[in-house]
């Protein structure tokens, strides 16, 4: 006859030792008690990161989370809300007062991600020093830096500004005209910089840009600089200014400018508007010529 089966409380079988339910469930109970301990072990690291990068977290909240929420609730973009504020608080025909109003709105209401007063002073000083006959701005955004350049242009100076987004360009156009600058002095072109640069000479009668401001997407800076070179739009001695070269950063652009041998480079260190602890800067390049 075969080996008899023995039935016991738990797990039983032929020749198997008795295993109680408590013993079987014991590892599951141990795993459950270890999770809080692991979480507590990571708590100091999380706190350290939050403290160290608190400025970046605040920036993320203001530029992404709160902005997206207000976009959904209002049905308007941040540039459109900013322009509505300017209409009710700024003096028409006074570009300085309009700029101050935008700064106040960005600091006290919604963060605008604009150039801000510190970088703005650097930009205006350089435009006044260089006295360019023609300026090309790539990245109009809300028109803040456009007003800065237009204020500092010499008599008879001309500014062409390029914005790829039609809705943003419409806001910038209204702001520029509200400040008192007409189309002969400030011309806004709607289109991507990649498409507009090859057409500047033929369609917009721009044979040379004495000063260029790159203020759109940092990852496009190198491409657009090389396009300007390829179409011979930079005369010897031309100044190229590039915003946001440290944050979010344009490393390939800076590496090219420093290594190609055609530019003298200088970096103006600043912080972000309302976030001075987040380091940024404006690159100033002086073009020596193609040779």
From Swiss-Prot:
One of the record's GO cellular component terms: membrane
Root EC class: transferase
Keywords associated with the record: Catecholamine metabolism, Cytoplasm, Deafness, Endoplasmic reticulum, Hearing, Membrane, Methyltransferase, Neurotransmitter degradation, S-adenosyl-L-methionine, Transferase, Transmembrane, Transmembrane helix
EC number: 2.1.1.6
Pfam families tied to this protein: Methyltransf_3
UniProt entry tagged with the keyword Transport: no
InterPro entries: SAM-dependent_MTases_sf, SAM_O-MeTrfase
A GO biological process held by the record: dopamine metabolic process
Reactions mediated catalytically: a catechol + S-adenosyl-L-methionine = a guaiacol + S-adenosyl-L-homocysteine + H(+)
Residues bound to S-adenosyl-L-methionine: 137, 139-140, 145, 163, 193
The UniProt record lists the keyword Hydrolase: no
Membrane-spanning parts: 31-51
CDD domains in alphabetical order: AdoMet_MTases
Any one GO molecular function term: catechol O-methyltransferase activity
Family to which the UniProt record says this protein belongs: Belongs to the class I-like SAM-binding methyltransferase superfamily. Cation-dependent O-methyltransferase family.
Additional note from the record: LRRC51 and TOMT were originally considered as alternative reading frames, LRTOMT1 and LRTOMT2 of the same LRTOMT gene in primates.
Subunit structure: Interacts with LHFPL5, PCDH15, TMC1, TMC2 and TMIE. Interacts directly with TMC1. The interaction of TOMT with TMC1 and TMC2 is required for the transportation of TMC1/2 into the stereocilia of hair cells.
Protein function: Catalyzes the O-methylation, and thereby the inactivation, of catecholamine neurotransmitters and catechol hormones. Required for auditory function. Component of the cochlear hair cell's mechanotransduction (MET) machinery. Involved in the assembly of the asymmetric tip-link MET complex. Required for transportation of TMC1 and TMC2 proteins into the mechanically sensitive stereocilia of the hair cells. The function in MET is independent of the enzymatic activity.
Stated name of the protein: Transmembrane O-methyltransferase
Organism field: Pan troglodytes (Chimpanzee)
Gene symbol of the encoding locus: TOMT
């Amino acid at each position: 006859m075969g080996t008899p089966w023995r039935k016991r409380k738990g797990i039983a079988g032929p020749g198997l030792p008795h295993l109680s339910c408590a013993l079987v469930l014991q590892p599951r109970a141990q795993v459950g008690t270890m999770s809080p301990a692991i979480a507590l072990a990571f708590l100091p690291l999380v706190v350290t990161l939050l403290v160290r990068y608190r400025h970046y977290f605040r920036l993320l909240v203001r530029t992404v989370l709160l902005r997206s929420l207000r976009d959904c609730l209002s049905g308007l973009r941040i540039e459109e809300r900013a322009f509505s504020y300017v209409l009710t608080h700024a003096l028409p025909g006074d570009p300085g007062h309009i700029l101050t109003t935008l700064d106040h709105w960005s600091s006290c209401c919604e963060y605008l991600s604009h150039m801000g007063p510190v970088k703005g002073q650097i930009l205006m000083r350089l435009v006044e020093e260089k006295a360019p006959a023609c300026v090309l701005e790539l990245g109009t955004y809300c028109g803040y830096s456009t007003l800065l350049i237009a204020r500092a242009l010499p008599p008879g100076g001309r500014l062409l500004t390029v914005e790829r987004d039609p809705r943003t360009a419409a806001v910038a156009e209204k702001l520029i005209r509200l400040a008192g600058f007409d189309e002969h002095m400030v011309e806004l072109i709607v289109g991507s910089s990649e498409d507009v640069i090859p057409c500047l000479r033929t369609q917009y009668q721009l044979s040379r840009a004495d000063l260029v401001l790159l203020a759109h997407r940092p990852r496009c800076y190198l491409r657009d600089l090389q396009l300007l070179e390829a179409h011979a739009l930079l005369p010897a001695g031309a100044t190229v200014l590039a915003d946001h070269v440290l944050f979010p950063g344009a490393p390939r652009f800076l590496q090219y400018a420093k290594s190609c041998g055609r530019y003298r480079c200088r970096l103006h260190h600043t912080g972000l508007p309302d976030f001075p602890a987040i380091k940024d800067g404006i690159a100033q390049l002086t073009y020596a010529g193609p040779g």
